[in-house]
C-alpha cells in the first residue's frame, strides 16, 4: 500500500500552474481546498467503484499540494514532489523543508496524523458524509470537509492555541494572563471536549512528543508555558487539554 501511495504522488502540470497563482498570504487550508477541487476537475471520478482509488490519490497528493504552493509562493522554488520517504509525515516535512527529516520529527508528524485520523465523528467528517449521502464524488466530499475543517472552532483550534501560547514568555506570565481571560469569560482554545468528559486520551500521547521536541531544541518557554496553562485550566475550571493544545 505504501508503494501504491508513493506511485500516486506526482501532481498534474495544470494543478501546479493553479497553485502558482495562489497568493503567498493565503491560508494553507484554502490552498488544500482549492487543490483538491482542481484535482477533481482534472481527474474526474467516473464511477463509484473508483472511489477507493480516488481517495488514495487525494491522500498521496495532499502533502505535495500544500508544499508546492508554499515553496513556490515563499521561496520561488518549483519542488519535485516525489521523494524516497515511505510515510506521509516524512514526505510532507521533506517537501516543506527541502531536506529529509530526522527520525524524531518524522515520528512526531506521523503520530499527529494518526491521532487526528483515528478521532471520532466531528464537523468535517460529518460534512463529508452529508456530501456523500447525495452520491456526490469523492473530490467534492473532501473539498467540503476541508471547508468545514477550516473553521476556527474545528481545525483552527490548534492554530488559535499556538497564537495564545506564543504571546507569553514565562509560566508566571501565562498563569496571570490565563486567570485574566477566565475572569473576562474569554474563550480559551484547546480545552474540553464534546464527547470526552474526564480527559482526552490523545492529549496524553501528543504531550509526550511535544516534550521530546522541546528537549531536542532546548526550548525553555513554549513547553513550560503550555504545561502551566494546562495546570491553571484544570485547577480553576476542571477543564482538560484536548488533542489540539499540545499539537500546537
Language-model features: where?
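Hydrophobic alpha-helical bundle cores within soluble ligand-binding/oligomerization subdomains
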Residues: 1-248
Amino acid at each position: 500500500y505504501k508503494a501504491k501511495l508513493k506511485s500516486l504522488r506526482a501532481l498534474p502540470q495544470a494543478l501546479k500552474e493553479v497553485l502558482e497563482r495562489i497568493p503567498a498570504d493565503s491560508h494553507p487550508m484554502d490552498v488544500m481546498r482549492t487543490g483538491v477541487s482542481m484535482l477533481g476537475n482534472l481527474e474526474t471520478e467516473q464511477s463509484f467503484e473508483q472511489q477507493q482509488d480516488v481517495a488514495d490519490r487525494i491522500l498521496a497528493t495532499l502533502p505535495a499540494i500544500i508544499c508546492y504552493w508554499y515553496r513556490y509562493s515563499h521561496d520561488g522554488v518549483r519542488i519535485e514532489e516525489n521523494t524516497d520517504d515511505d510515510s506521509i509525515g516524512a514526505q510532507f516535512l521533506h517537501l516543506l523543508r527541502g531536506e529529509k527529516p530526522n527520525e524524531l520529527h518524522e515520528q512526531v508528524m506521523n503520530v499527529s496524523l494518526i491521532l487526528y485520523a483515528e478521532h471520532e465523528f466531528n464537523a468535517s467528517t460529518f460534512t463529508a458524509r452529508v456530501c456523500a449521502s447525495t452520491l456526490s464524488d469523492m473530490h467534492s466530499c473532501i473539498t467540503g470537509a476541508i471547508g468545514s475543517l477550516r473553521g476556527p472552532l474545528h481545525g483552527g483550534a490548534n492554530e488559535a492555541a499556538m497564537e495564545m501560547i506564543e504571546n507569553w514568555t514565562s509560566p508566571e506570565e501565562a498563569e496571570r494572563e490565563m486567570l485574566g481571560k477566565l475572569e473576562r469569560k474569554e474563550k480559551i482554545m484547546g480545552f474540553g471536549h464534546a464527547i470526552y468528559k474526564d480527559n482526552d486520551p490523545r492529549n496524553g500521547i501528543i504531550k509526550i512528543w511535544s516534550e521530546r521536541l522541546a528537549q531536542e531544541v532546548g526550548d525553555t518557554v513554549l513547553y513550560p508555558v503550555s504545561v502551566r496553562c494546562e495546570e491553571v485550566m484544570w485547577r480553576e475550571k476542571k477543564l482538560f487539554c484536548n488533542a489540539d493544545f499540545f499539537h500546537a
